């Protein structure tokens, strides 16, 4: 029995059995960020400080200890204030230190400032210089020991083992065709394993006793000779430091520093755990350096592999890859800063007088501050947050990247790393990843996954005992899961929790198989546990091809928040949690009653009488220029509970994600206007603001100090009429609420002009009239081409107010323009199933195809977009949406619903359409007989005639994507040129031209359009003198002169000459007597503009033409 949940006017119907709905609630979706940062503050920072303590000077007289406790001061600015002032939301760190003078026994204790640490906001982001940033989680190879099987040149199996620490030298053991064991330290030359083991001070007996097959290693001892400890150390030194005289102490020191010094070598907690697990050791977790026991056990496992005992490792298995989140990445950065700090402290201890030293004079916060700043400002993993809509924000915080420092690079990453691995099940989404060069390197955390203390991804399972679910939930990592028989989340279960299916499909050791219910160990908690949040918002996901689902998941993140958000008629039940965890909606922290509601804030009185205020965001600009605005959804007097939603954010409605609009669709061709993914829409979507969005843009101008005096922000602008200044106030800054078009002045600014800046006629006037006219140049901030909008905010920053300005600036003015963008031809719209298209025509309502009751459809999609792309989910969604619209209800359909009956989606849609037909009483709503089941006869709006055959009609959820034609359309008449090649720049931002590339040249060559081609490659591009003369000729109405030499050709010649190749151009001149001579042409000559003005033009090139360049 479906349960009805009422929200607003439309009842919600959850379709699917109560046992399999996500009744197991999702975890907090931003937990990965917050938990990691909390760990850093509670443990990570202290751990790093203590690892550097004590710092002693070179003589050993002074010692500086860092103590356990550190303090954080209150942040200087709040989050909102930091955003407004363009500063960083951070706290100051103070740490207790103790300076001990060993000679006098004097002890000084002091709290020392060690730097500023950016604080995470409660939404899991950081505010750096006023911009919200996210630290992306990195997925890297875990430290530990890895065994690999390789074939040598003769095709014989050999094995090797790599011992990878968290930081320090790599150790590689390998066997060869002669059954000898070798070792490499940090990819240097091969060294016999005997040498290393003897250098560690082990005797023959200790070595051979550690092995299961000592006879195998005996060969290496016999072949390589038996070394004493001293000889082994000398040999080791020779191999690692060739060319230096070897000494025993040198060898000893080399070994110590490489593997046994905690400062230089660290396995990390994870490395030690993995090593103990793989080699079955019981070394304590606090021992983070190598022990002889580790090395012996590694070699023993390697030898056992030769006897088919044990197994090689799969490095793409998630048991061997771990996640480094904010906390750990930050900790590594702090270590870098402390390393630099340690050197400075040592030097200061040595240089200064011992009596005058205090901890504060020793510790300089600069290196630590610089390291942290560098990480947040320029690391590949610190990214400008994607704030297009709440889902984009949420997904960005849950992203997993294999790129970045210590990770892979795009070029080196092969196919295996990018591919889906069986261990991704329930941990990394197999669907959501970018298209293009980063495919497979950037992923998204699955809905229920979490990261454990070692950094491995875990996923929850329900425990099964004797074929019955016990209700207990257990999180398993990828390598733990391999040992159990695990059934999928859509297994049929009865009321008592007994598994009904027999046999059950299970996964065991990365293979699919069958088992009886009694053999099953675990069942997945939910069918959507394998996909990410964005993917889980796609209804009928199981009916879509994975490639299209990928596009659907990625495009939801690009949906622009619309003016009036509307929830989907067909959802999946996760919209509420996605909106809540994105942080865009306001959630009550207490139980209580609403005492005040306005557009600015909401106040709640708790049960103890205390009032809490929740301020609302209004028309703020997001990182992507979309609009962030919150609307209250409660009224005064309402009782609210802790966790209830008080206000909607952008792209949410009723506390649920609402990225698009439900619109009436017909799948049919229409006059070729929806050929190749083009889309035909009705005027209604424009006039009723169905797809209208608000965009807020920021414009900024600085008044700087120049050599000739300060720039001034003023209303007094030379050569500008009063009409252009009508929207400026007395300071010369635009007033809030003014409507601005392209070219209007936002902020008036004048710059002092030097003598050299003046044209000669002005100098002449000056000389005659002797008056010093105001020597300033207009440098105002104007609205750029193609932009218009209303001024919603103006902010002025000056030093007097205490704002931090960039060096050299006296004043910064920032103007925010908001514009309403209606949907128009060229905009990109998409559904949730990867069905995307560009709007090709907007038809009047009366011309659109209409239904039997006279309703015109809103959008016409091409039916050919469905079969070959195999995203049939959109058809199910359309039909169920049609039923929902007729019945006035909304549906929540969990994906993967076939556990109780085959083709469950089809039965559900059929059942609901039958119900819709009964409720409306219109037989045409659903025809379930005849040839055209589920299709509706539509009529041509232009003629009123019925179309050839019935078509599929229904409600589909479409989104307008951020690729708006307004931001892309661009034209250039004249504009800037590149300095080197003298060709026009590219791109809208640079006012660039259209690139006429190699293939376009082929096209003109194929048509033999020689003159057009010559013009394109010369005067329209980089023939410098030619283009000026051509412009001159056009202006004066004369014939266009003949093109000269393109600049890029000269650059090519110069480059060849710089390589030492003598490249010159010659032409053959025919004399009057018929003889010819060879003349060298200087291509560079016309740089000085000495080109003869009377050069032949196209029209006066008469007679026998000689293909030659005129001489200058």
UniProtKB/Swiss-Prot annotation:
Disordered: where is this region? 1087-1112
Task: List the keywords (alphabetical).
Answer: DNA-directed RNA polymerase, Nucleotidyltransferase, Transcription, Transferase
Q: What is its EC number?
A: 2.7.7.6
Provide the reaction this enzyme catalyses. RNA(n) + a ribonucleoside 5'-triphosphate = RNA(n+1) + diphosphate
Molecular-function GO term, any one: DNA binding
Instruction: Give the GO terms filed under biological process for this record.
Output: DNA-templated transcription
Q: Quick one: a GO cellular component term?
A: DNA-directed RNA polymerase complex
Top-level division of the source organism's lineage: Bacteria
Question: Transmembrane ranges?
Answer: none
Q: Please describe what this protein does.
A: DNA-dependent RNA polymerase catalyzes the transcription of DNA into RNA using the four ribonucleoside triphosphates as substrates.
> Which family does the entry's similarity section mention?
Belongs to the RNA polymerase beta chain family.
Subunit details? In cyanobacteria the RNAP catalytic core is composed of 2 alpha, 1 beta, 1 beta', 1 gamma and 1 omega subunit. When a sigma factor is associated with the core the holoenzyme is formed, which can initiate transcription.
Name of the molecule in the record = DNA-directed RNA polymerase subunit beta
Organism of origin? Gloeobacter violaceus (strain ATCC 29082 / PCC 7421)
Recorded name of the encoding gene: rpoB
């Amino acid at each position: 029995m479906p349960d009805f949940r009422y929200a607003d006017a439309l009842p919600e119907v959850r379709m699917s059995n109560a046992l399999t709905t996500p009744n197991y609630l999702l975890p907090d979706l931003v937990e990965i960020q917050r938990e990691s940062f909390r760990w850093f503050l509670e443990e990570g920072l202290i751990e790093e400080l203590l690892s550097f303590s004590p710092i002693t000077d070179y003589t050993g007289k002074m010692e500086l200890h860092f103590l356990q406790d550190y303090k954080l001061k209150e942040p200087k600015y709040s989050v909102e204030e930091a955003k407004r002032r363009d500063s960083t939301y951070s706290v100051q760190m103070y740490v207790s230190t103790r300076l001990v003078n060993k000679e006098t026994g004097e002890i000084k204790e002091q709290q020392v400032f060690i730097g500023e640490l950016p604080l995470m906001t409660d939404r899991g982001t950081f505010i750096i210089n006023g911009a919200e940033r996210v630290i992306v989680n990195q997925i890297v190879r875990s430290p530990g020991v890895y065994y690999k099987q390789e074939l040598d040149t003769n095709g014989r199996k050999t094995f090797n083992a790599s011992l990878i620490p968290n930081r320090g030298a790599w150790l590689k053991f390998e066997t060869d065709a002669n059954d000898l064991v070798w070792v490499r330290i940090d990819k240097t030359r091969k060294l016999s394993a005997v040498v290393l083991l003897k250098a560690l001070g082990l005797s023959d007996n200790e070595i051979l006793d550690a092995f299961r097959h000592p006879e195998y290693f005996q060969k290496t001892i016999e072949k390589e000779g038996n070394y004493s400890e001293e000889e082994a150390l000398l040999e080791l030194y020779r191999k690692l430091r060739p060319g230096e005289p070897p000494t025993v102490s040198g060898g000893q020191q080399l070994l110590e520093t490489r593997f046994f010094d905690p400062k230089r070598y660290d396995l990390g907690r994870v490395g030690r755990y993995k090593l103990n697990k793989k080699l079955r050791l019981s070394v304590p977790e606090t021992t983070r350096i190598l022990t002889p026991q580790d090395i012996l056990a590694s070699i023993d496992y390697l030898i056992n592999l030769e006897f088919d005992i044990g197994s090689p490792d799969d490095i793409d298995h998630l048991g061997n890859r771990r996640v480094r989140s904010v906390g750990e990445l930050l900790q590594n950065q702090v270590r870098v800063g402390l390393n630099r700090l340690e050197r400075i402290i040592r030097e200061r201890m040595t240089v200064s007088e011992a009596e005058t030293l205090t901890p504060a004079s020793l510790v300089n916060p600069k290196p630590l501050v610089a390291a942290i700043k560098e990480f947040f400002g320029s690391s590949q993993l610190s990214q400008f947050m994607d704030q297009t809509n709440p889902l984009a924000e949420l997904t960005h915080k849950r992203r997993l990247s294999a790129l970045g420092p210590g990770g892979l690079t795009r070029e080196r990453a092969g196919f295996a790393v990018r591919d889906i691995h069986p261990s991704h099940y329930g941990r990394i989404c197999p669907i959501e990843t970018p298209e293009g060069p980063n495919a497979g390197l950037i992923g998204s955390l699955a809905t229920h996954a979490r990261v454990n203390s070692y950094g491995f991804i875990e996923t929850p399972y329900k425990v099964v005992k004797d074929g019955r679910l016990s209700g207990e939930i257990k999180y398993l990592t990828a390598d733990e899961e391999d040992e159990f028989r695990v059934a999928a989340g859509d297994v049929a279960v009865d009321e008592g929790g007994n598994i009904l299916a027999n046999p059950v499909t299970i996964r065991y050791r990365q293979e699919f198989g069958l088992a009886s219910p009694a053999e099953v160990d675990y069942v997945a908690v939910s069918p959507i546990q394998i996909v990410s949040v964005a993917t889980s918002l796609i209804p009928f996901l199981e009916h879509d091809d994975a490639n299209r689902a990928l596009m659907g998941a990625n495009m939801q993140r690009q949906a622009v928040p619309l003016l009036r958000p509307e929830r989907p008629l067909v959802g999946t039940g996760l919209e509420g949690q996605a909106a809540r965890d994105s942080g865009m909606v306001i959630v009550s922290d207490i139980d209580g009653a609403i005492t005040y509601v306005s557009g600015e804030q909401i106040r709640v009185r708790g049960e103890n009488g205390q009032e809490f205020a929740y301020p609302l965001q209004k028309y703020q600009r997001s990182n992507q220029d979309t609009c962030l605005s919150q609307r209250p959804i409660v009224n005064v007097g309402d009782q609210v509970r802790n966790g209830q939603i008080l206000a909607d954010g952008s792209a949410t409605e009723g506390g649920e994600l609402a990225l698009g609009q439900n619109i009436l669709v017909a799948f049919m061709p229409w006059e070729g206007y929806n050929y190749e993914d083009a889309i035909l829409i009705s005027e209604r979507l424009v006039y009723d603001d169905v797809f209208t969005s608000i965009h807020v843009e920021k414009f900024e101008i600085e008044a700087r100090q120049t050599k000739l005096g300060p720039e001034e922000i003023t209303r007094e602008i030379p050569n500008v009429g009063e009409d252009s200044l009508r929207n400026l106030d007395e300071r010369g800054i635009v007033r809030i609420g003014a409507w601005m078009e392209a070219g209007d002045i936002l902020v008036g600014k004048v710059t002092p002009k030097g003598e050299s800046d003046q044209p000669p006629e002005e100098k002449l006037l000056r000389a005659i009239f002797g008056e010093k006219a105001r020597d300033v140049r207009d440098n105002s901030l104007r609205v750029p081409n193609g932009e218009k909008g209303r001024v919603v905010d103006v902010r002025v920053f000056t030093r007097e107010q205490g704002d931090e300005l960039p060096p050299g600036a006296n004043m910064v003015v920032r103007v925010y323009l908001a514009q309403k963008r209606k949907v128009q031809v060229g905009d990109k719209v998409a559904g949730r199933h990867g069905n995307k298209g560009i709007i090709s025509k907007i038809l009047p309502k009366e011309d659109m195809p209409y239904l039997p009751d006279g309703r015109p459809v809103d959008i016409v999609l091409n039916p050919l977009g469905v079969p070959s792309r195999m995203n049939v989910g959109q058809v199910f969604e359309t039909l169920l949406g049609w039923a929902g619209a007729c019945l006035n209800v909304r549906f929540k359909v969990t994906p993967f619903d076939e556990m109780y009956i085959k083709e469950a989606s089809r039965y559900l849609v059929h059942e609901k359409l039958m119900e819709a037909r009964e409720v409306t009483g219109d037989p045409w709503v659903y025809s379930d007989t005849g040839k055209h089941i589920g299709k509706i006869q539509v009529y041509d709006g232009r003629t009123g005639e019925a179309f050839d055959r019935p078509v599929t009609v229904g409600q589909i959820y479409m989104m307008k994507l951020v690729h708006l034609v307004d931001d892309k359309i661009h034209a250039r008449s004249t504009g800037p040129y590149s300095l080197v090649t003298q060709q026009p720049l590219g791109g809208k931002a640079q006012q660039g031209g259209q690139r006429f590339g190699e293939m376009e040249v082929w096209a003109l060559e194929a048509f033999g359009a020689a003159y057009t081609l010559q013009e394109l490659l010369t005067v329209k591009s980089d023939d410098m003198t030619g283009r000026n003369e051509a412009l001159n000729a056009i202006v004066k109405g004369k014939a266009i002169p003949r093109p000269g030499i393109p600049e890029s050709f000269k650059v090519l010649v110069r480059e060849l000459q710089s390589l030492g190749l003598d490249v010159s151009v010659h032409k053959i001149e025919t004399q009057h007597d018929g003889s010819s001579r060879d003349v060298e042409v200087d291509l560079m000559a016309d740089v000085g503009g000495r080109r003869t003005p009377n050069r032949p033009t196209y029209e006066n090139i008469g007679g026998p033409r000689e293909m030659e360049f005129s001489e200058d």
